[in-house]
């Protein structure tokens, strides 16, 4: 008795052999090991850029509100001490108009605290005992005494050391004119703590 095979069917079972599967897994593991450090770096850069951009957004909101309302607008750390703990943007409408947040002031924006692995340092009015950034009705960066107030804030990862610290730092520079920009000190020679644009 002879068996007839159906046309179009082979006698070999469909699927992968164990060797083919092991080679595929080995190649995938090698590719993952090569890509993982790049992914971590990309994630860190993304978080850092997002924090710097959030600060610039707050600065631009304050400047825009100051020009729109014809009043001083201020950016202050939420806890009145550290920029890392978040910041509040408000229009100084109170009778004192002293650059501090009062009940009668208009809160425009609030930023929650940054992640614990960020460190923020500052110069200019942003580094005073009670730090602040103030913009007048023309959009200029001002001090409480009425002078021009250029300032710089550096946002860096505090969980790194060595050469990677420079790569993982962003500076927000606010010029006398009130214009804010973000730069990376490791690649931009004009990105200094004393830059006043």
State where each predicted segment sits.
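N-terminal helix-rich module
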Residues: 1-13, 22-25, 30-60, 64, ...
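Residues within the helices of the helix-turn-helix
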Residues: 19
């Amino acid at each position: 008795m002879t068996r007839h095979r159906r046309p179009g069917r082979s006698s070999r079972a469909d699927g992968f052999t164990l060797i083919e599967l092991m080679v595929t897994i080995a190649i995938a593991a090698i590719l993952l090991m090569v890509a993982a450090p790049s992914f971590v770096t990309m994630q860190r850069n993304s978080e850092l850029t997002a924090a710097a951009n959030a600060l610039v957004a707050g600065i631009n909101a304050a400047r825009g509100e100051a020009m729109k309302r014809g009043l001083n607008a201020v950016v202050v750390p939420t806890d009145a001490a550290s920029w890392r703990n978040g910041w509040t943007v408000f229009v100084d409408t109170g009778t004192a108009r002293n650059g501090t947040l009062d009940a009668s002031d208009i809160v425009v924006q609030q930023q929650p605290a940054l992640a614990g692995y960020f460190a923020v340092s500052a110069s200019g009015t942003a580094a005073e005992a009670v730090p602040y950034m103030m913009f007048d009705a023309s959009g200029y960066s001002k001090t409480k005494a009425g002078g021009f107030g250029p300032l710089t804030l550096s946002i860096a990862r505090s969980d790194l050391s060595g050469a990677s610290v420079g790569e993982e730092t962003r500076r927000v520079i606010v010029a006398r004119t009130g214009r804010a920009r973000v730069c990376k000190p490791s690649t931009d020679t004009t990105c200094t703590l004393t830059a006043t644009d």
